[in-house]
């Protein structure tokens, strides 16, 4: 079989049609850009590299070779925060900041180990003259008991009359219960008097 060599122009034209290109410059343009990159693309790459080193949380891992080619113009765009001097408190033209700081540092009792300073102010507890501890004397309790005894005796006598009509055994049982309750009441009264007035307890025989 005979092999016929096609001319170069026909081959280039057919390749351009297959690639969808109309000019030869469009096919050669990517190759030229790969060999001679544009200055704008270089600046964009340099800007991305600097951002990958400056912005925290960037996906790019730190590379020491890239640090050497950092663009130092970024430092001008993002300057470091400068420390501002402390504002001075002035009172009639006199600077009192230094004096206050010295007083706080000298007073060790008002400074903690972590550097937090406090001002100790004496606390005055409010005194209410109307609120006073209630004290009951034993004389007032005795007078109350004396006033209560007559009606109690009257009720006891009436109850005794009613019980006597029912039977002697029931009367004796009721009197015993009344005596036990009376002794219990006297012991309770003696305990209250001892707590309030700190006196010796009443001995009940």
Swiss-Prot record:
Database matches in Pfam families: Corona_I
Keywords for this protein: Virion
CDD domains linked: embe-CoV_Protein-I_like
Stored InterPro entries: Corona_nucI, N2-like_embe-CoV
Location of the protein in the cell: Virion
Keyword rRNA-binding part of the UniProt annotation: no
Chief place of localization: virion
Cellular-component GO terms for this entry: virion component
Keyword Kinase recorded: no
Note: The gene encoding this protein is included within the N gene (alternative ORF).
Sequence similarity: Belongs to the coronavirus I protein family.
Functional description taken from the UniProt entry: Structural protein that is not essential for the viral replication either in tissue culture or in its natural host.
Name recorded for this polypeptide: Protein I
Organism encoding this protein: Human coronavirus HKU1 (isolate N5) (HCoV-HKU1)
């Amino acid at each position: 079989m005979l092999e016929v060599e096609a001319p170069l122009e026909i081959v280039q034209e057919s390749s351009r049609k297959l690639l969808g290109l109309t000019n030869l410059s469009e096919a050669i343009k990517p190759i030229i850009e790969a060999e001679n990159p544009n200055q704008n693309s270089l600046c964009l790459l340099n800007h991305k590299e600097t951002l990958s080193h400056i912005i925290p949380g960037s996906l790019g891992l730190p590379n020491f070779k890239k640090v050497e080619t950092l663009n130092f113009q970024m430092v001008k765009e993002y300057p470091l925060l400068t420390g501002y001097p402390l504002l001075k408190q002035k009172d009639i033209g006199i600077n009192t900041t230094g004096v206050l700081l010295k007083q706080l540092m000298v007073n060790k009792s008002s400074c903690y180990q972590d550097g937090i300073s406090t001002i100790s102010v004496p606390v005055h507890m409010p005194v209410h003259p109307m609120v006073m501890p209630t004290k009951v004397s034993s004389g007032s309790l005795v007078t109350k008991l004396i006033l209560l005894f007559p009606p109690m005796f009257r009720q006891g006598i009436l109850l005794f009359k009613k019980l006597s009509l029912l039977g002697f055994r029931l009367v004796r049982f009721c009197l015993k219960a009344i005596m036990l309750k009376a002794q219990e009441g006297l012991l309770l009264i003696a305990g209250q008097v001892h707590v309030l007035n700190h006196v010796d307890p009443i001995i009940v025989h």
